[in-house]
Amino acid sequence: MLTFTIRRLILAVPTLLFISLVIFLLLELAPGDPMAQVPLTVPPEVKEKMRLALGLGEPVHIRFWKWLVQFFWIEPQVLIDNIFGTTFSAGDLRVISWQTRSPVMDIVVQRLPQTLWVVGTAYIVAIVIALPIGIYSAYRQYSWFDQMGTFVSMVGFSVPPFFSGVLVIVIFSVQLGWFPSIYDTTLVVDSWDTFVKQLQQMVMPVMVLALQITAQLSRFMRASMLDNLNQDYVRTARAKGLSEYVVVMVHVLRNSMIPVVTVIALGIPSIFGGAIITEQVFKVNGIGQLLIGAIQANDLPMVQTLTFIFAVLIVLFNLIADVLYGILDPRIRYD
Amino acid sequence: MLDQPIAQIKGLRVEFQTKDGPVVGVQDVSFDVNPGETVCIVGESGSGKSVSSLSLMRLVEFGGGEITSGQLVFDRREGGQVDLGDTDQALMKQIRGNEIGMIFQEPMTALNPVFTVGRQLTEGLRIHKNMNKAQAEARAIELLREVRIPEPERRMKQYPHELSGGMRQRVVIAMAMACEPRLLIADEPTTALDVTIQAEILALMDRLKRETGTAVMFITHDMAVVAQMADRVVVMFRGNKVEEGTVHEIFENPQHDYTKALLAAVPKLGEMSGKNYPEPMKLMGAEDQKIEPIKGSDEVILNVENLVTRFPVKGGLLRRTVANVHAVEDVSFKVFKGQTLSLVGESGCGKSSAGRSILRLVEPQSGKVEFEGRDILGLNQNELHKARQDMQMIFQDPFASLNPQMQLMDQVAEPMRNYGLASGSELQDRVANLFDRVHLPRSFMRRYPHEMSGGQRQRIAIARALALNPKLIVADEAVSALDVSVQAQVLNLMMELQAELGLSFLFISHDMAVVERVSHQVGVMYLGRIVEIGPRARVFENPQHAYTQALMKAVPIADPNQRKSEKDLNFKPIPSPIHDLNYSPEPSQYMEVAPGHFVLTTDSGY
Amino acid sequence: MTDAAKKDPLQHSSVQQEAEKAPRSQWRDVWDQFKSHRGALSGGILFLIICVGVIFGPLVYWNDAQYVPTGRDFIKLRDMRPIYHALWDPSAKMDWAYPLGTDNLGRDTLSRLMFGGRVSLAVGMAAMVLALLLGSLVGVVAGYFKRLDGLLMRLTDLFLALPLLPMILVAAVLFRESLSKSIGPEGGVFVLIVCLIGITSWMPTARIVRGDVLAIKEREFVLAARSIGTKPDKIISRHILPNVLSPIMVSATLGIATAIITESALSFLGFGFPPDFPTWGRLLNDAVDRMTLFPERVLWPGILISLTVLSVNYLGDGLRDALDPRIRGR
Amino acid sequence: ERGSDGQVNIIYWQAPSILNPFLSGGTKDVEAASLVIEPLARYNSSGEMVPWLAEEIPTTSNGGVSEDLTSITWKLKKGIKWSDGSELTSADVKFTYEYCTHPEGGCAQVTKFEGVTSVETPDDYTVVVTFGAATPFPYGPFVGGESPILQKAQFEQCMGAKAPECTDANFGPIGTGPFVVEEFKPNDVITFVANDQYRDASKPAFSRVLFKGGGDATAAGRAVLETGEFDYAWNLQLAPDVISQMEAAGKGKAVAGFGPLVERLMLNNTNPSPDLGPDERSVVRPHPFLSDPAVYKAMSMAIDRELLVEIGYGKAGKVTCSWVPAPEAYAISPEGCNVQDVAGANAMLDEAGIVDTDGDGIREKDGVPLKVLYQTSTNAVRQDFQALIKQWWSEIGIDAELRNINASVFFGGDPGSPDTFQKFYADVEMYANTFNGTDPQSYFGNGLCDKAPTPASQWQGENISRFCDEEFDALHAELSGTADMAKRVEIGQKLNTIIFEKGGMIPLVHRGRLSAHANTLGGVDLNVWDSELWNIADWHRAE
Ligand SMILES: Nc1ncnc2c1ncn2[C@@H]1O[C@H](COP(=O)(O)OP(=O)(O)OP(=O)(O)O)[C@@H](O)[C@H]1O
Ligand SMILES: Nc1ncnc2c1ncn2[C@@H]1O[C@H](COP(=O)(O)OP(=O)(O)OP(=O)(O)O)[C@@H](O)[C@H]1O
Ligand SMILES: [Mg+2]
Ligand SMILES: [Mg+2]
């Protein structure tokens, strides 16, 4: 298992380098201009100067190389400096965002908490809801509960968040006035009141996101449970005189969780990737909003860095999912 | 109290609700199980054996079945008799595992793969006997010892897949015995196991029964096992009980036609002694059967010399080969035209690998395979493609070896399509002829594999193998998965084809009785090597190698008078065939003890 | 027990009896099984209705989806409410000629829904088919040919990591002009969008198919096929693909939904069809701002998208069962 | 009293990414920064200049502007303190000039300093700006929200190429304004607290400002008008029915102000045919049919501008046919501008011999069918306009193919993209443009022949229509040399007329800026000539 992990990690390096190159070239090819949001009143010569000041005058390969150095060499130093108070990175140029002229990583670090809070909670909520639904639907296959579950999850799956998001805002903020329609990212949770406030502002985005994730996860859980409910060992467990609860919730569930856990693990990068539309609808201003904003403003270093971090997470969690599989299922041995 | 039966099944009827309306699983089945007695229930697949036993546990309900009438009276340890048919599930929970234990057919799947053996063993104990963890573990270890599992402490922490099939089945037995039930139901506990392991398990159950006085309800379709185990026998046929009697009555004086047919279909070890050539079995219901020995010829069709097949074991960061599985090690034999060479041996000894190596379905390491004078190992892909036309294979599992998504006609036609032998209506005709050949109605051509019984399926596999008019067929456990009656038909079919078409067979099996019936030559394999090879009569009547002798001893005989006891058995676990890269095995050397009868003189590992 | 069984107890007489029945045609079987699946049948019928509605609706319906009333008509005809609105608000502005009302520019909602459905369904199906083809291809090849496995799986990682929007921009730059020259502006955008959605959504299918292929490859019938001289391409097409159909079907049903929604998100961001070219996603999106005033404008496209997804899902369930001979036999 | 009214919440649906307007130039950034850093003089809501950090507005009459119009002398107010307690001096002003004109700095506001040859500081409170040539309007430097004064002490180390490295300074400039940055989360939210060094001891009334960014205009409007979570929402580009429905909730109201922003249809004066090579496409004049006055006039006549205003902008829009509709004096109102005349348009085309010869409902001119590609950026109102105009044009036999392009591509000047508005690979395109301040001279320059974007100029250039007219060029030259206000206005009107009559563009709507504030927010005075938040020091809670 260890060698498997190490081997895959080593393999990941060229993969990621290649991915970063592809992303870079893609962004390079994409039309758009960092000056797009500068008002039309600013004349083109000035824009051209501003472009040069951003380093756009240099050839492509040099910029790619610079980015590589900044991302893989300087940023880790900055990280070390921040943790240990050293000064390795002093004076080195970090990956700088074109929109804000500040280090990209700083903004990412600033954004991450919101995203993790909202998308992460949604993910957890979805898991907490989806698993029981999936389990029960499978256990009572074709019952009305199961049919309802199918129906609701399909609807949940097919309703785009720009609709469901606005819908809950209209209902809960505008009509009922229960929750704020705009997420306050400056809120510091340090007391019961602020905690309640935080909960209130998280309810709606979490609800919208969780609906979609629940829809998919519960389908998965159901299928996996169905696979296992008909296995011979379930009969063995019953023949031992175990209660239905233990049979289903211990024996069957433990086996059914194996594929589901890997699916969950595979979905984790998307937590960090944020939820572009939902974040936008609720003004959560997390990573997803950062990315879409950066794409719209053609802030290439930002887009490149964010997508690349995302790629790293995807590759990493692919690996984690495989390893988890090996851990959860004693039959699987990676040599 | 003593002569009162532990379980009485009266007029049991079980129905299953399916899409096409209710299906009757068993109808009006009645029999008793007395204390300390082993009742064997026999019958072909689908005859309702499992359904009866599951009803007794009230587990049919979880499979969609329903007990629509009848009583299942069970004599509880305390509290007298109850009708299990209408107890609630809460009470059933206390009875299951505690007063009735059950052993299931498939040791590979009957255990939960993700829990340790210890956990699964102690579960029942902790519920029914209110033991704490330590007590339960102590008892579990004791149980493992009772079922003769070596190193029980270590096994407790292992997962099922880390144990061999035999050990797993013992764990299942230990689990069923854990709470000392009054009734033990064993649903085909040995069907999936090797002869040697089967013999051990049967002996073990017999001993446990005698030691604890538990009543046993033993379900099987193997008459030899019945002869070995039963006190009383219940014969079932298509959901009904057709006959009941003591084991001697049944074997010596069967009343019902079905029972008679069943007994006729069982190949008995020793039946062929004195005959030099194999001949088809005499079956009930097939009147105009001609039983003639199949002689074959002396012409060598396949010559295998020093065949070595190894599978690499990869590891390390670079996934280099770190060791090899020595699946086939220096094996030589000859197959004669129109004759059958059988390879026998325990699971994992390399029989299949040898068979596949000959067709180059796995690539052998070295050696020589000469088929009709052509060196098979030297062919390139195109030539090999052509050569395979003359060599075909039939696989063990008739369920797995047919594509579930293809109509039978297409599956049989596929080889001819591949070689462009026929097309259009000619192809249709040839397929139809093949169906005739294997005695399947032509109307089956449009069916799918799942619509066929196992035997019929295996005939399709045979038809497919025959489609190219091969000269040699490698039959890898071609009948192992079949019911006795079906097995007999398939065996007869194979022999018929051999007689008519002059086919040669390389017959791979672990069933000594079957091998005795069909072979001209027999090779006994152990750990990748042939330890003994020679004409069938000699090898069976005069086994020379220690392993062959042990193997012969293990085979149960379908005769209640020839029971075996545990102490006759003497098997060592097979050593690992995995060796590291610089291991070089010594070449096999044989001694010719009689003309054509060779025995391995070098160390075989046994 | 029947007489036949008595005479020949070893024969499976039930099988024998069946054997006398006339051979059934395969498609007949599929249809029979499909019919017996209640959900599938209703899903299928619903889907058919939707398809017929969007394909033939505009041909027989009297209003034109792109027509904007002008002059004095404009004020009169805009913001018309659906006729059922009269049930609770008889004073609302409505007209039987516009059964579902009109939008803020006076375009007829029903005809826009029908017209938009054509586009959405076409995009959804085409993109789904493309994604399935790609996903199955990659999955099968990766699963079957061990040597390509690592490479293809890393490729999957790459595609998972690629951001959709820049890709769309790049594709638009590279291909839009030439495509719209050869197949017209709408056709060009259609091909572009379908390709993009397809290219960015095949990865989950590939992963699942690969896993199944890995398992099926080890089944004996594949070995058997090899021993009877079947070439690898035929092994894949005859033996492996039919057996991974069921996960592919599941991906397909989810794929349609994702494709329809992705298309709407693209229109939303300005990368989609020309603005006067309605699609369900765009209708939904355009109406969100006036959701409280004119709830019907969001509800109808929303309901239609959901219904399509739902019906396709049930349809897929039924088809999967019907195409699997094992289930069909039961 | 300072800080007595608690917190005010402002929402901008575009989030500020930096608080240094010299590095960004985006309106959102300029306006967010205007809470902190201030110019010497500002425009008030009626477009008049008011002294801000300066004592008074220098003019020729008070001697602040030299007679030859080549220098202007500003006197700073005394005793103005930076928020760190140090005093504002003329050195800071001079530094700001140096900062922005540094060749490697990429300053977005460098045009403000166009023509400036030097900035002198005779003493701590005097700044003399010298121009290379006579400058009739010398109020570019240090006037308005785009040209505020930076603190020398803070930005000294951030000149030129180092500018982006000073993240702390760019995110938290020290200023003289009513508020001080407390925390800046780029592209998300800014919190400000009242500046206790602010020159007016009773201001600002609010102690804190929460400045939230992101989302979309609908959500911003909803947050102010419907849920009341926010007090002020900027630039609500929403359809009027949506706005009025939101206002119906009674939590706040929308206010509009009019600058020179005009939504217009640009007519391509060159041939955009894809068959032409990359160096000729949208370069060679004339357009196959748009150059015919009958065609573009008919196109203009077929448009119902009043309806467009009603559909798209409501009270934030006015019918206009002027390129420069504000300041009002420059506006023209050609006859028939506010009425739709489809019949007239048809007659005009018929008369010009542009008729439908092949019976497909589309007219042909010299065999070329009048099919136009009509593009704009993605935006709900613009798409509605497209649909309406397409319909109207179809009634005069002109077929329009619509295309909408993502704004960041459309307005991004990427020479590699075929979809930018500068490339104009279409026959007609619609967008809005404006200019800063009140003097349109350089804006009128956007119609000069040599400002047309070409491959040679990397497709940069403001003459998007590729309009070219000798008379126009001559008049513009005359305008540059004229200081007399009445004369300037007269020339301006002529220029407006030429561009309309000769097919440079079809102005559609004079757009105002529509912002919304809560009923409880007092002191809002919507200003379109400067930062909307220009008078935030006067904002207060109203009952
Ligand atoms: N869950 C079920 N649903 C429908 N029919 C069933 C079910 N289980 C069993 N049956 C039917 O009941 C009959 C008896 O089956 P049973 O499993 O008892 O056979 P068996 O004698 O144990 O066969 P085998 O030797 O193959 O185990 C069969 O015809 C079978 O088709
Ligand atoms: N593809 C393979 N890769 C690695 N090892 C293999 C492979 N196939 C077989 N082996 C190993 O080779 C040995 C011989 O296997 P083989 O299948 O030939 O045994 P067998 O006698 O046919 O057993 P059975 O009766 O169970 O079929 C076993 O140890 C098995 O684990
Ligand atoms: Mg059974
Ligand atoms: Mg084998």
Predicted regions and their residues:
Chain C
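Gly/Trp-centered helix-boundary motif
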Residues: 1-136, 147, 236, 259-260, ...
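Generic hydrophobic transmembrane alpha-helix motif, especially the helices
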Residues: 99, 130-144, 151-214, 219, ...
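Amphipathic cytosolic juxtamembrane alpha-helices at the membrane-cytosol interface
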Residues: 107-122, 126, 146-153, 206, ...
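Conserved G/P- and acidic residue-centered "switch" motifs that form tight phosphate/ATP-binding loops
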Residues: 135, 139, 229, 242-244, ...
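Helix-loop interface residues and adjacent transmembrane-helix termini in multi-pass membrane transporters
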Residues: 144-145, 187, 253, 268, ...
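Non-cytoplasmic
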Residues: 166-170, 174, 194, 248-282
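Alpha-helical transmembrane segments
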Residues: 198, 202, 206, 255, ...
